[in-house]
Regions:
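General secondary-structure propensity
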Residues: 2-6, 91-98, 186-187
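Extended alpha-helical scaffolding segments used for macromolecular assembly and cargo binding
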Residues: 12, 80-173, 177-180
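Short, intrinsically disordered, charge-balanced linker/junction segments flanking boundaries
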Residues: 98, 178-179, 185-194
Length: 194
Protein backbone atom coordinates (compact mmCIF):
# COMPACT_ATOMS: atom_id res chain seq x y z
CA UNK A 1 0.00 0.00 0.00
CA UNK A 2 2.77 2.42 0.94
CA UNK A 3 4.67 1.64 -2.25
CA UNK A 4 1.48 2.17 -4.27
CA UNK A 5 0.79 5.59 -2.73
CA UNK A 6 4.44 6.61 -3.11
CA UNK A 7 4.63 5.50 -6.75
CA UNK A 8 1.51 7.48 -7.66
CA UNK A 9 2.97 10.80 -6.49
CA UNK A 10 5.04 13.05 -8.72
CA UNK A 11 8.84 13.13 -8.44
CA UNK A 12 8.87 16.50 -6.67
CA UNK A 13 6.52 15.22 -3.95
CA UNK A 14 8.51 12.00 -3.55
CA UNK A 15 11.69 14.02 -3.05
CA UNK A 16 9.99 16.21 -0.42
CA UNK A 17 8.84 13.09 1.42
CA UNK A 18 12.26 11.44 1.32
CA UNK A 19 14.13 14.57 2.38
CA UNK A 20 11.77 15.44 5.22
CA UNK A 21 11.98 11.84 6.48
CA UNK A 22 15.59 12.56 7.42
CA UNK A 23 14.21 14.36 10.49
CA UNK A 24 12.00 12.71 13.13
CA UNK A 25 9.53 15.62 13.15
CA UNK A 26 9.01 18.89 11.31
CA UNK A 27 7.06 22.10 11.21
CA UNK A 28 6.01 23.55 7.89
CA UNK A 29 9.07 25.82 7.89
CA UNK A 30 11.39 22.92 8.70
CA UNK A 31 9.86 20.83 5.89
CA UNK A 32 10.51 23.61 3.40
CA UNK A 33 14.03 24.24 4.64
CA UNK A 34 15.19 20.62 4.75
CA UNK A 35 13.62 19.74 1.39
CA UNK A 36 14.49 22.97 -0.41
CA UNK A 37 10.96 22.92 -1.81
CA UNK A 38 8.61 25.90 -1.25
CA UNK A 39 5.49 23.68 -1.22
CA UNK A 40 6.83 21.12 1.26
CA UNK A 41 4.67 22.35 4.14
CA UNK A 42 1.56 22.05 1.98
CA UNK A 43 2.51 18.54 0.85
CA UNK A 44 2.93 17.34 4.44
CA UNK A 45 -0.30 19.07 5.55
CA UNK A 46 -2.18 17.44 2.67
CA UNK A 47 -0.94 13.99 3.67
CA UNK A 48 -2.12 14.65 7.22
CA UNK A 49 -5.55 15.86 6.05
CA UNK A 50 -5.93 12.76 3.88
CA UNK A 51 -5.00 10.52 6.83
CA UNK A 52 -1.92 9.18 5.09
CA UNK A 53 1.00 8.24 7.34
CA UNK A 54 1.35 11.58 9.16
CA UNK A 55 0.60 12.52 12.77
CA UNK A 56 0.14 16.08 13.90
CA UNK A 57 1.02 17.53 17.30
CA UNK A 58 0.17 21.02 18.39
CA UNK A 59 1.98 22.45 21.40
CA UNK A 60 3.71 25.80 21.03
CA UNK A 61 3.79 25.07 17.30
CA UNK A 62 2.22 22.60 14.90
CA UNK A 63 4.56 19.69 14.25
CA UNK A 64 4.21 16.78 11.87
CA UNK A 65 5.70 13.34 12.21
CA UNK A 66 5.60 10.42 9.80
CA UNK A 67 4.32 7.09 11.09
CA UNK A 68 7.35 4.95 11.97
CA UNK A 69 6.94 2.39 9.19
CA UNK A 70 6.31 5.08 6.59
CA UNK A 71 9.40 6.99 7.69
CA UNK A 72 11.44 3.80 7.56
CA UNK A 73 10.11 3.16 4.04
CA UNK A 74 11.06 6.70 2.97
CA UNK A 75 14.54 6.39 4.43
CA UNK A 76 15.02 3.12 2.54
CA UNK A 77 13.86 4.86 -0.64
CA UNK A 78 16.47 7.58 -0.07
CA UNK A 79 19.21 4.95 -0.38
CA UNK A 80 17.74 3.70 -3.64
CA UNK A 81 16.91 7.08 -5.16
CA UNK A 82 20.01 9.15 -4.32
CA UNK A 83 23.66 8.53 -5.08
CA UNK A 84 25.82 8.16 -1.96
CA UNK A 85 27.40 11.63 -2.21
CA UNK A 86 24.08 13.35 -2.82
CA UNK A 87 22.46 11.53 0.11
CA UNK A 88 25.38 12.49 2.32
CA UNK A 89 24.93 16.13 1.29
CA UNK A 90 21.19 15.95 2.02
CA UNK A 91 21.89 14.45 5.44
CA UNK A 92 24.34 17.25 6.23
CA UNK A 93 21.72 19.79 5.24
CA UNK A 94 19.22 17.96 7.46
CA UNK A 95 21.75 18.00 10.31
CA UNK A 96 22.15 21.78 10.00
CA UNK A 97 18.39 22.25 9.96
CA UNK A 98 17.99 19.90 12.94
CA UNK A 99 20.64 21.86 14.84
CA UNK A 100 18.97 25.17 13.99
CA UNK A 101 15.62 23.92 15.31
CA UNK A 102 17.12 22.28 18.42
CA UNK A 103 16.76 18.67 17.33
CA UNK A 104 20.19 18.09 18.84
CA UNK A 105 20.19 14.27 18.98
CA UNK A 106 19.20 14.14 15.32
CA UNK A 107 21.84 16.70 14.33
CA UNK A 108 24.53 14.79 16.23
CA UNK A 109 23.57 11.46 14.67
CA UNK A 110 23.41 12.90 11.13
CA UNK A 111 26.78 14.64 11.49
CA UNK A 112 28.26 11.34 12.70
CA UNK A 113 26.59 9.34 9.90
CA UNK A 114 28.09 11.65 7.29
CA UNK A 115 31.45 11.83 9.06
CA UNK A 116 31.15 15.61 9.40
CA UNK A 117 33.66 15.60 12.25
CA UNK A 118 34.29 19.36 12.29
CA UNK A 119 30.58 20.15 12.59
CA UNK A 120 30.02 17.42 15.17
CA UNK A 121 33.00 18.57 17.23
CA UNK A 122 31.85 22.20 17.09
CA UNK A 123 28.34 21.27 18.20
CA UNK A 124 29.59 19.11 21.08
CA UNK A 125 31.88 21.90 22.27
CA UNK A 126 29.01 24.41 22.11
CA UNK A 127 26.78 22.09 24.15
CA UNK A 128 29.37 20.74 26.60
CA UNK A 129 28.95 23.18 29.46
CA UNK A 130 25.15 23.20 29.29
CA UNK A 131 25.00 19.42 29.22
CA UNK A 132 27.24 19.15 32.27
CA UNK A 133 25.10 21.66 34.19
CA UNK A 134 22.02 19.62 33.26
CA UNK A 135 23.69 16.42 34.48
CA UNK A 136 23.65 14.87 31.01
CA UNK A 137 27.11 13.35 31.42
CA UNK A 138 26.40 10.08 29.64
CA UNK A 139 24.68 11.76 26.71
CA UNK A 140 27.66 14.06 26.28
CA UNK A 141 29.95 11.03 26.43
CA UNK A 142 27.81 9.26 23.81
CA UNK A 143 28.10 12.24 21.50
CA UNK A 144 31.88 12.34 21.89
CA UNK A 145 32.17 8.59 21.35
CA UNK A 146 30.64 8.98 17.89
CA UNK A 147 33.89 10.57 16.71
CA UNK A 148 36.76 8.21 15.85
CA UNK A 149 39.45 8.09 18.51
CA UNK A 150 41.96 9.81 16.20
CA UNK A 151 39.57 12.74 15.77
CA UNK A 152 39.02 12.97 19.51
CA UNK A 153 42.73 12.92 20.28
CA UNK A 154 43.53 15.90 18.06
CA UNK A 155 40.81 18.13 19.49
CA UNK A 156 41.71 19.39 22.98
CA UNK A 157 38.24 20.74 23.70
CA UNK A 158 36.69 17.33 23.00
CA UNK A 159 39.20 15.73 25.35
CA UNK A 160 38.33 18.35 27.95
CA UNK A 161 34.56 17.76 27.67
CA UNK A 162 35.13 14.00 27.64
CA UNK A 163 37.13 14.26 30.85
CA UNK A 164 34.58 16.50 32.51
CA UNK A 165 31.71 14.19 31.54
CA UNK A 166 33.53 11.16 32.98
CA UNK A 167 34.48 12.68 36.35
CA UNK A 168 31.49 11.24 38.18
CA UNK A 169 31.47 7.77 36.58
CA UNK A 170 35.07 7.02 35.64
CA UNK A 171 37.57 9.31 37.38
CA UNK A 172 40.62 7.42 36.07
CA UNK A 173 39.56 7.84 32.42
CA UNK A 174 38.54 11.43 33.20
CA UNK A 175 42.01 12.21 34.47
CA UNK A 176 43.61 10.69 31.35
CA UNK A 177 41.34 12.78 29.10
CA UNK A 178 41.98 15.97 31.06
CA UNK A 179 45.75 15.43 31.07
CA UNK A 180 45.71 14.79 27.31
CA UNK A 181 43.59 17.93 26.83
CA UNK A 182 46.02 19.97 28.92
CA UNK A 183 48.98 18.73 26.87
CA UNK A 184 47.13 19.59 23.64
CA UNK A 185 46.30 23.07 24.94
CA UNK A 186 49.95 23.57 25.91
CA UNK A 187 51.19 22.37 22.53
CA UNK A 188 48.76 24.48 20.49
CA UNK A 189 48.91 27.52 22.75
CA UNK A 190 45.12 27.45 23.02
CA UNK A 191 43.71 29.04 26.14
CA UNK A 192 41.39 26.83 28.16
CA UNK A 193 39.73 29.92 29.62
CA UNK A 194 38.73 31.20 26.18
Amino acid sequence: FTEHIFARTDLSTREVLMRTALLPWMTGAIAEEVSGHPSAAQIVRDLYRRGLFVDRRADAQVRYQYHDLFREFLLDRCHVHYEREELSSLKRTAAKVAEKYRQVDTAVDLYAETQAWDELSRLICELGETMLVQGRFQTLQRYISLLPSAEQQQRPWLLYWSGMSRLVFDPVAARADLEAAYQQFERTGDNIEG
